[in-house]
Amino acid sequence: MGYDLYVVTDETIGRGRTHTDLARLAAAGGADVIQLRDKRLPGRDLLSAAVAIREITTDAGALFIVNDRLDVAIAAGADGVHLGANDLPVGEARRIVPPGFLIGASVGSVAAAVRAAAEGADYVALSPTFATGSKDDAGPGCGLAALKEIRAAVSLPLVAIGGITAANVADVIAAGADGVAVISAVVGEGDVTAAARSLRDRIAAAKAEGR
């Protein structure tokens, strides 16, 4: 299972669609990974959404990741958890999760990527790769140069997140990313399934060109 197209749900830009709706539509468009992310929802409601998305991703053959909430991820039977810089440290999470449980880590530098790899991360995500409006606290983009540096420093799967669009996805793949994580480029679109499918096709074309 790869990380080519990694879709993060966000009800605030989902045009009235729920996390479950967005996950179903993105999975239909070929998303390889669905991440449930919502910093506002109470744990009980987040778990309810996670259980529903677990069923959707299982049927679609996609990975299911929960952002930040390790407890919800484990309770829902998710494939893994994604941890940001201010979340539980990767090493502590690795110590308590079941075997085979995936841990992803947001990183903003080579040093952070190397540290995450050493602590047991299964993949790292350069965040933000470009400036983005999807996360208020994302900060300025790290750029393609940082992506290339991290690619040279770690052998883990590398995902680019932040400001990824159809216009720049080929450059991101050429810089060494194994996949891209997107929010607005898919879940903010009117036709989520078509947006996911189009982006996935662009990723596949970029990878084929780089071979």
Curated annotation (Swiss-Prot):
Keyword set includes Transferase: yes
What is the stated purpose of this protein?
Condenses 4-methyl-5-(beta-hydroxyethyl)thiazole monophosphate (THZ-P) and 2-methyl-4-amino-5-hydroxymethyl pyrimidine pyrophosphate (HMP-PP) to form thiamine monophosphate (TMP).
Q: What class of enzyme is it?
A: transferase
Catalytic activity of the protein: 2-[(2R,5Z)-2-carboxy-4-methylthiazol-5(2H)-ylidene]ethyl phosphate + 4-amino-2-methyl-5-(diphosphooxymethyl)pyrimidine + 2 H(+) = thiamine phosphate + CO2 + diphosphate; 2-(2-carboxy-4-methylthiazol-5-yl)ethyl phosphate + 4-amino-2-methyl-5-(diphosphooxymethyl)pyrimidine + 2 H(+) = thiamine phosphate + CO2 + diphosphate; 4-methyl-5-(2-phosphooxyethyl)-thiazole + 4-amino-2-methyl-5-(diphosphooxymethyl)pyrimidine + H(+) = thiamine phosphate + diphosphate
* Textual note on the cofactor: Binds 1 Mg(2+) ion per subunit.
Q: Could you identify this protein by its name?
A: Thiamine-phosphate synthase
| Source species of the chain | Methanoculleus marisnigri (strain ATCC 35101 / DSM 1498 / JR1)
**Pathway(s) the chain acts in:** Cofactor biosynthesis; thiamine diphosphate biosynthesis; thiamine phosphate from 4-amino-2-methyl-5-diphosphomethylpyrimidine and 4-methyl-5-(2-phosphoethyl)-thiazole: step 1/1
A single Gene Ontology CC annotation of this entry is: cytoplasm
| Any one GO biological process | thiamine biosynthetic process
Which cofactor does this sequence's record say it needs?
A: Mg(2+)
| CDD domains noted in UniProt | TMP_TenI (cd00564)
Q: Name one GO molecular function term.
A: magnesium ion binding
Q: Which family does it belong to?
A: Belongs to the thiamine-phosphate synthase family.
Q: Which gene encodes it?
A: thiE
Q: Keyword set for this entry?
A: Magnesium, Metal-binding, Thiamine biosynthesis, Transferase
Its EC number is 2.5.1.3
| Keyword Cell membrane applies | no
- Pfam families named in the record: TMP-TENI
Q: Which HAMAP family match?
A: TMP_synthase
Binding-site list for 4-amino-2-methyl-5-(diphosphooxymethyl)pyrimidine: 35-39, 67, 106, 135
Under the heading InterPro entries, the entry gives: Aldolase_TIM (IPR013785), ThiamineP_synth_sf (IPR036206), ThiamineP_synth_TenI (IPR022998), TMP_synthase (IPR034291)
Q: Which domain of life is it from?
A: Archaea
Per UniProt, Mg(2+) binds at 68, 87
Residues given in the record as 2-[(2R,5Z)-2-carboxy-4-methylthiazol-5(2H)-ylidene]ethyl phosphate binding sites: 132-134, 163, 183-184
